[in-house]
Amino acid sequence: MAGRGLISDEYQNVLCKMGEHIVYLDGLDQDSSWVIAREPLHSAADNYVIRRACGNASNAKTGKGPGLSFALKAHRLLKNASLIGPDFQIGLIPTAVGGSRIEYWRPGAVLFNRLIAQVRAGVRIASENGRNAKVRGILFYQGESDACQEDLAEYYRTFLQVSSR
């Protein structure tokens, strides 16, 4: 979900008009802070050093992904259904690493451990700022690196391990 889509000024202007309803955890671990969401969400999370450690040495530029559009739509639907108040915020914690294989997301693997650390940091930082943050869901999009997986049964076993945590 790291995203490689082009980011236009027009798209960023639309995001600015959305106000402070969507925020994201910008930075890694202790250096993180909650800020108004802008693309690219994954500029810190999806860096070259992390991709290289997972066997993807491409230097692809991070761009627009599906996370922010998903959050904007979710906020609109929840608000229209009167399930949230006018000041409710959705917080995104970007952890995607473009080009990573699902095996790096297994419980105990490097990216899984990093994901858990980021979520804990996000909840802690929100709490320190007087916010009552709760993890309510996860948007997991696994794609191209496992598209030609020969052993689909093993892929789905791994996916179930990742998604059941």
Features from the language model and the residues they span:
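Cell-envelope and extracellular/periplasmic
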Residues: M1-R165
